[in-house]
Every structure is written in C-alpha cells, then in structure tokens.
Amino acid sequence: MISDITDKIIPEIQEWQKRKLESVYPIVFIDATHFHVRDNGQIVKKAAYVVLGIDKDGMKKVSTITIGKNESAKYWMTVLNEFKNHGVQDILVLCADGLTGLKDAISAIYPKAEYQRCIVHQIRNSLKYVPYTDRKELANDLKTVYKASTEELRYTNLLELEEKWKHKYPGAIQSWIDNWDVLSVFFKFSAEIRKIMYTTNAIESLNSTYKRINRNRNVFPTDMSLLKVLYLSTLKAEKKWSRMVDKWDLCLSQFRIMYEGRI
C-alpha cells in the first residue's frame, strides 16, 4: 500500500523536524494552507503553517511545517520557541498575513524582529468583496499608497484613499488604517528588498503546490498523513530553488548597515 511505503519516510521527517537551523535569518515568511483532516472521528479544518527562511547566503529553505487548528498568541509562542530551540537566535524581518496572535508572540520571543504584514494578502483581502466595476479603480488607488516614493506621500495618499472610499467600502479601507504600523515597515527598505518582501514568489509557489494536493485529496486520515505529503511536496519544490535571491549581495549589504552587529 502507498501508506506503507510513505510510512518509511516518517523517521526522515522526524530528523528533518529536529535539524539545526541557521542562527540568523534576514527574512522569514510564514503562511498557511488549510486542509480537511479526520480527528477523533470528525472531519475538521486544519492549517498547515509553513515557515520559509531566506538565509545569509540568499537561499530559500522551508524551515518548519506545523499543523494546528487554532491560531493564538500561545500557539505562535510555541512555534517560535521551537524555532529558537533549533538554533535561530535572531530574525530581522518576519513577513506574514494577519495571523491571530502572531504579532504578540513575535514581540515575546524575537523582540528585535520587525513584523511586516504581507502586502500581497492585504491587497487581496481589500479587493475580495469589491464588485468588478470598482475593483480596478480601487486597486489603482491602493498602488498610490504601497508604491509611493516617500513616507509622507504614502500617508497622504492613504488619507486620500480613506476619504474617497470609506463610505462605500469601509471594511477594505479601515484595515489599512488599523494595520498601518505593520504594513508600513515594508517602506523603510530599498526597492530590491521590498521586491523580495512584496512578491513572496517562493512561498506563493509552494502554496500553489499544496493547493494541488487539496484538489487531489478531500480528507486526510491523520495529521501525519498530511505532513508526509507536505514534506514530499516541499522537497520537490526546494529542488527548483537552486539560485540565490535576485540582487542578494546588494540586499545583504543594506541589511548589515540597517541591523549593525546582528548579521
């Protein structure tokens, strides 16, 4: 049976989960993909949280995959503590969607790390419930915020955006106002670093691989059966990541100036 064959990789997965990680990661991404898993006789929706790091050599690697039901500060403290126990002493910038409790957990475990909420997800969430007739115009107005050349211009454009759209789509606009502190970290960096943080191609392509798994299988019998498939898919995806991030030497020199003594 296929399950008997894949069971042979369980020790390999366990070793992978215990391996030593880099001491410092300039950029870390956390993202989630949801799957249906059987748990105590019931089918429940669980998230596979993927932590992907870009190391000092500019190489992308999946650091950990954890499967859980509930996001909370306590949950994320467990995940980040595990990260620290595997040797990660410092993270310069951590990019993620608005995962519940993550911001507080980062402050507790990696207090020097800067938390950047994912711009791509923020844009998607803002446009999700906007009718097609307004979507293009609002998307263009959002660009004036996240592509503005100066901090002053960005905030001015944000206020203009709020004034124009707040009555028609209050939820979409209020999210930018409420989360500006974790959306605006992005803007302190050069165009080269912002491109890495903005596009998140590595984790997006990885998630598209995971979503294909979802289409091919409706329900996983156990957490381990899900983890086995994710692990094998991750190994396959990582084989394509043979090159360093574009313009990494330039990015690294900027990180060393901005975070002197930490990298």
Q: What does each model-found stretch correspond to?
A:
Residues 1-5, 93-100, 105-141:
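Conserved beta-strand -> loop -> alpha-helix junction used to position metal-binding or nucleic-acid-contacting
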Residues 1-40, 93-95, 116-125, 152, ...:
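Conserved, well-ordered core segments of regulatory domains
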Residues 2-3, 45, 73-77, 96-103, ...:
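Amphipathic alpha-helical transducer elements in NTP-driven molecular machines
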Residues 3-14, 74-81, 85, 100, ...:
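A broad, structural surface signal
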Residues 8-96, 100, 104, 109-112, ...:
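RNase H-like nuclease fold core
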Residues 19, 35, 42, 52, ...:
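Flexible, active-site-adjacent loop/turn segments at secondary-structure boundaries
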Residues 38, 104, 128, 208-211:
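Active-site-proximal flexible loops/turns
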Residues 111, 144-263:
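Acidic/histidine-rich catalytic cores and adjacent linkers
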